[in-house]
Amino acid sequence: MTRKFLFLFIGVFLIGSLAFSQEIQVQELEHKNPLAGVQITVKKSKESIFTSSEGKANLSIFTEKNDLILSLSGYQTLVLTWEQLEAKDYLVFLEPSPFTLQTTVISASRWNQNALDVPGKIRGLDRQELFLKHPVTTADWLGGSGEVFVQKSQLGGGSPMIRGFSANRLLYSIDGVRMNTAIFRSGNLQQVISLDPFAIQNTEILFGPGSVMYGSDAIGGVMVFETLSPDLENQSFQGNILTRYSSAYAENTYHLDFSFGKGKWSFLSSASYFNYGDLIMGKNKGQPSYLREQFLSRQNGVDVELANSNPRKQVGTAYSQVNLMQKIRLQISKHVQLDYAFHYSTTSNVPRYDRLIEKRDGKLRFARWDYGPQRWMMQQLAWKMTSATPLYDEFKLSLAYQYFEESRIERRVGNPIEFRREEQVHAFSINADFLKTIRDKNFLSYGIEAVKNRVSSNGETTNITNLTLSPTSSRYPESIWDSWAVYSNYSAELSTQMKMQGALRVNLNSLEADFTKNLSYYPLPVSSYRDRYFSLTGNLGIVFQAHPNFSLSPLISTGFRAPNVDDMGKIFDSAPGTVLIPNPSLGPEYAYNAELNVHQQIGGIVKVDITGYYTLLDHAMVRRESTLNGQSQIVYNGQLSKVFALQNASFAEIKGLQAGIELVLHKHLLFTSRYNWQKGKEELDDKSTSPSRHAAPAFGTSKLSFKKANFQIDFHAQYSAEVPFDQMPQEELSKPAIYATNSEGNLYSPSWIIFSLSGQFQLSPRISLAGGIENIGDLQYRPYSSGLVSPGRNFHLTLKGNF
């Protein structure tokens, strides 16, 4: 009996020791601090795990005993065998990487994948930079990358421009769920600010129309956001708290997130509050027209134009915002995981600054022009299963519901009638994604997607003197927009030096619209509309890696965008004295893209990446003069306005160059620079051409970073080239309020460069301090196409604690 107990004890001890030995501990080399979020994968397997806040992870989920790969942004990727891991007693150290351009794992195929295997250009943003860079919104987070140009009509906004495209020609993905709706606009789009920058875990920008796994309408690219998630390894209560102040914004920001787990359950909560005052512009150089010398005030029932005591204060830009997020994870078994996520964002009323500064005969036009609260809510239920079957090795199912609400409130000076138009969108989506490894280093990912949008739109006027309410025309027809898609991506290793990747997407879109509510206001040509659009898009690329430090990647791809409700059915004053009307004959547009990506690393000192691309947009949807019932002008909101409609032009084309360089000057000193040049043109009615509106001027960033121990400081420059009058897009020439004038009195957008200094210091293991000076020279500048003048010299300070 004693012998049996002895054997039993030894067996239990060995099993326990084996289980214990499967737990890896990852630390940073210099200070031996634990590293959280390290991704651990096994070669020839798509399964991955992440280290906890204590730098630990359980390796028992890996059945394959191939080499382990440990990767974390900002650190050198480590590959080691299981024998080497055992020899290190399961304690591993990662060395800081001198380079930041590399992204070890990306989600171009909707699954984690090595960036070296992807032929297209992808940029991952380092979350560790969030604390240092002080992005006011997620739009600023993207703009700080040096890869995305951001237009702002108001402080509570930010419309990204990528490779000459913007708005509904770009696609947003939140935790794998499509954010784009049927009313995403063709002009400038502000929805990206609904996402809390402090709740973002990973950000990736997939450039060009080759991102068929996310949507055929991603003409310019896809912005992929992964938000913070619960950590099953964390069984304790922990979190972060942050407060931030900035002078030019009169900002007060507060953020809290915390997580905890118990057994198979884990939870994460996040909340942020942002409050901004009227933005202060710079005082040096600039233009007299940039100053806010007057503003409107309602006094004793009369609109009064008042002198601004501080013309650099952009009266009518203040707003606030709240973001909430809750996630719950249940590890049902070793191979099955269930996740629930809730997101909510709302703003206060957001004054549209570019409209508030419009003048007619030297007098301000609008007494009020606000976006009502921009609300976004998403609920998602995701099921993930890992189990080797003939059809898949991994499977993900996502069910999501999103609610969007937006409104516009406007009133002209001296007119008691206030117009309010409000829209709601209910968006339902299903995604099923499968991953199958084929013959070791080849894999196939495929899936299906179904999306349904229900659009409701209403219009109302209020007489502010007697509060009388009356109906008026709505912005959109009552509509239903559907999308069904099947997509696949195949990645193969053709040789040790060459990899191939190809993808296909079959998409069917349908649109139904009912214009009945607006027929009493405008003689529209139809009372209802119904159409379907079928598309087949794809991409094919090769990664040729002749040397470990050099790769050449050609890629061809196509895109397709069918008209949505905003394109086809909108009634809106798109510019002063103009009105955009529905066009039921509007057809889809087709994109054809070719690009070449080159990566070169010279020793451990220099790293360069260059991308050249060309995109042809056939049957491009552009604004052109039109008529309604034979009339070239109609009365809209009480003003005689010239009629325009979106129509299919013969073509539009974009060509460009993207370049980046990193230079290690010292083990603690790194220089980085990114530069983007793009030119676009579109055909006009008379067969002449005009520069494309969303092809931003050349822009970029350069940065010198010093990082040592618990201290980092960055000196960086951000710059943009001039858009002279003869290169101004025709559409922009109708917006004199937002552009400077040259010596001949013609509109143009001046070049600019600003310098900023930022730093962060780890005061203790639990307290960090960050701060800096933005726009040190206090330059007065307005980025191309923006109504908002950018902030002047801005002092910002952030205090962060963790527990």
Model-derived features with residue positions:
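Surface-exposed extracellular loop regions of Gram-negative outer-membrane beta-barrel proteins
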Residues: 348, 403-407, 461, 508-521, ...
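Outer membrane beta-barrel strand-and-loop segments of large Gram-negative receptors
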Residues: 317, 423-434, 483-485, 581-587, ...
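Short, acidic, small-residue-rich periplasmic hinge/interaction motif at the N-terminus
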Residues: 27, 31, 39-43, 71-75, ...
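Transmembrane beta-barrel wall of Gram-negative outer-membrane proteins
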Residues: 249-275, 286-349, 375-377, 438-439, ...
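Flexible loop and strand-edge segments within Gram-negative outer membrane beta-barrel domains
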Residues: 315-321, 331-392, 403-426, 472-478, ...
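Short acidic/polar hinge/loop motifs at secondary-structure boundaries
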Residues: 179-207
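N-terminal periplasmic accessory domains that precede
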Residues: 89-93, 136-141, 158-161, 173, ...
